[in-house]
Amino acid sequence: MSGALHAWYSLRDLEALGGRQGELGGELELARLPRLASLLHSTAGSVRASLHFRQRGLGRLTATLDLTTTVELTCQRCLEPFAQPIAARVELLFVEPGEAGAETPQDYEPIELDDGRLLPARLIEDELIVAIPFVPKHARVEDCGSLARNLVT
C-alpha cells in the first residue's frame, strides 16, 4: 500500500514494527517525489519499495530498504532521454540526533528521524537521488542521439 509510504511514523510506531519484524511497502509515483522529479527527464513511472524493520542488540532499530525502478534521465552527451534502471538495498540504523557518526556499524547507514518521526517516502526519495549517476549519460556513445554522433564524426 503506497499510502503507508506517504504517512509519518513516530519512533514508537517504528519500534513496534521492529519488534514484530514488520514491513512497510508499496509503489510510489515518481511525480510525487518533487526533489527527484527535478532531476528526471520524465516523471512517468513509479518506484517499488519496501522497508523491513527489526530490533538489533541493545534495542537498536534497523531496517532494510529495497527499491527498484527505471527512471528517465537526460543524457549529458546528446541531451536526449534514456532509461536508467535503479535497484538498491540499503541497511539503515535509526539513531538519535547528533549520533550519526558515533558507533554506527560499517554496513549501516545512520538515519536521524525528523523530530522523532519518519516519512518513508522522503527516505526512499533520498536513496533514489543518491543512486542517480552524477553525470547521466548513455552507457555507450553509439547509443547517443545525433548531437553526440555529429561531435564524434
Language model: regions and residue ranges:
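Acidic and generally charged, gly/proline-rich low-complexity regions
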Residues: 1-153
